[in-house]
Amino acid sequence: AVNFSSTGDAADCVGCHTSHTVYRKNDEQSPSYDLNVAGLCSGCHADSVIVGTYFSAPEDSLAAASVALYHETVHGTRITDTGLVVSATCSDCHSPHRTLPGDSLASTLHRDSIATTCGRCHEDVLAKYAGAAHGGRSSGDAGDGHGHETPNCVDCHTAHGIVGAHEPNWFLHTVEECGQCHERLYETYLGTYHGKVTELGGELVAKCSDCHTAHDMRPATDALSSVHPTNVVATCAKCHEDANESFARYYVHGDPMNRAEFPLLFWPWVIVTAYVVGALLLFNVHTGMWLWRNARHAIRERRELRS
C-alpha cells in the first residue's frame, strides 16, 4: 500500500484478484489459489524493472533472486512438481494483505517472528526449537555473548533457497553453517577424523546435527541434551553400534594447542612435533654431510687422475 500510493507500481487488489472474475481462494481458477500464488507474485518480483528499482543494493541480492530460488527449493518444487497445496508459498510467509519489511516489529518475518511463522507448518520443530539453546530469545537479547544474534530458521535454512535436509549438498555444508557462529568449535571439529573426512566430501561421518540434533540442541550440562554424560553413549551408538563409556570419552572438540584444558593432547603433540622436526633436521644434516663427502671424494679423484 505504501509503494502503491507513492510510486504506483505495487500490487493492488485488482492486480492480485482481477476485477470482475474474482474467484474464491480455494478455487483452482483463482490467482490466489495455493498452486498459483508463486506465479502471481512472480509477475512483479521477477520483473527486471521492479527488481532493479527496489532490490539493487548488494545486501538485497538474495531478495532480488527470491523467485528463481524459490522454484528450485523444497517448498517450490512441491508446489510446481507435485501439486502439494500444503507446501509453503509466498502468502504463507509474507501475509498477503499486510506485507511489511522484515525489520518491522509487526512483520511476520521480523527476527522475533520468523520461528512462529515457520512453526505454523512445522509445529513439532518449533516445539523443539523453543525449548532449546537457540530458541526462546528475542533479537534484543545479547545473543551468544560473542557478537552473534541468536539464530532462527532463516539463518540456517535461508529464506528462499531452502533445500531438503536429506540433500547431500546441504548435509555437507551444514557444518559451515554452524561454524559461522561457533568458529572455535568449527576449527576443532575440522581437526578430528569426522572433520577431515567431511572436508574431503564424505557424507557418512558425523556432522554437528548428528551429535547435537538439528533443533533440540542444549548445553552438555542439561540432562535432556544429546551430549549430556548420561546420553552421549547412546548418541555415539547411533553410528557406532558398539560404543561404550570409554569410547564416548573421545575428545570431539579437543584442541592440542590448549595446554590447560587438554594436557593429554598438548604434550603428545609437543613430543611428536619435536620428534618429527628433530628427525627432519637430522636427515637434512646427514644428507648435507653425505653430499659434501661425495663432492670432496669426486674432487680428490679428479686431481689424482690429472696427476
Language-model regions: role of each:
Residues 1-307:
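Short sequence/structural segments immediately N-terminal
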